[in-house]
Curated annotation (Swiss-Prot):
This is Phosphatidylglycerol--prolipoprotein diacylglyceryl transferase. PROSITE patterns: LGT. The chain crosses the membrane at residues 6-26, 50-70, 85-105, 112-132, 169-189, 197-217, 233-253. It is a multi-pass membrane protein. PANTHER family: PHOSPHATIDYLGLYCEROL--PROLIPOPROTEIN DIACYLGLYCERYL TRANSFERASE, PROLIPOPROTEIN DIACYLGLYCERYL TRANSFERASE. GO terms for cellular component: plasma membrane. Keywords: Cell membrane, Membrane, Transferase, Transmembrane, Transmembrane helix. The keyword Transmembrane helix applies. It comes from Wolbachia pipientis wMel.
Amino acid sequence: MSLNPVIFSIGPVSIYWYSLAYVLGIVFAYWYLHKLDDQKIFTKNFYDSLLTATIVGIILGGRLGYVLIYDPVLYISNPIEILKTWEGGMSFHGGAIGVLLAVIISCKRHNIPTFYALDLVSCGVPIGLFLGRIGNFINGELFGRVTTMPWGMVFPESGDNLLHHPSQLYEALFEGLLLFAVANSLFFLTRIRLYHGALTGIAVMWYGIARFFVEFFREPDYQIGYLWLDLTMGQLLSIPMVLLGMLVYLGALNLKFNTKSVT
């Protein structure tokens, strides 16, 4: 399977599907926040601040996370490669930290309840995750392990001409579409939105569990391979995510993180 990662080129400038996926994900999340904030807690200045901070957080956090965690030797020896984000190489965990900091900073600056904002962000972000994984699929990167399943695909980047799990699509489904469905069902159909932070905790737990599971079908990064207990780096990073999500969820229910309530 080989798809052209470039949408079109104008002279030396090329527009990539992977880059477009990030842009569409951010645009959707920005639009969706307006729809979810039916009580109009967010101000225009907050939206503008959050949008700018989120873009910076995603790019810097995602790229630096990948550079520092997955392939530091390569980028230290070829630092110019750090700037080539359109070729892939973004860490979700690094990007998540960047978005978290963006939300916290923006909320503090504009006196917005942080966990209220995080809950709403958790409802929109999964579509960005879905689009990002589709971008990975088009790039032919982050493919799965060798399989005999009829839906296996040959990825030229693997260099072995064997069938591999399309693990990018598994992640798009479990970490993107299903998380979007679960988060929004809870938001609209239950009273969980009254416990600020509870939905954030559930979303973080869901992603961590989904990522841990899908990693069993995903080829580990060649420069890292298998680590402790034959787990991948993605799995090891997902374990603290699950624990953190559980802590936030229980805290929202029992410690009343929503001290500044919005009713």
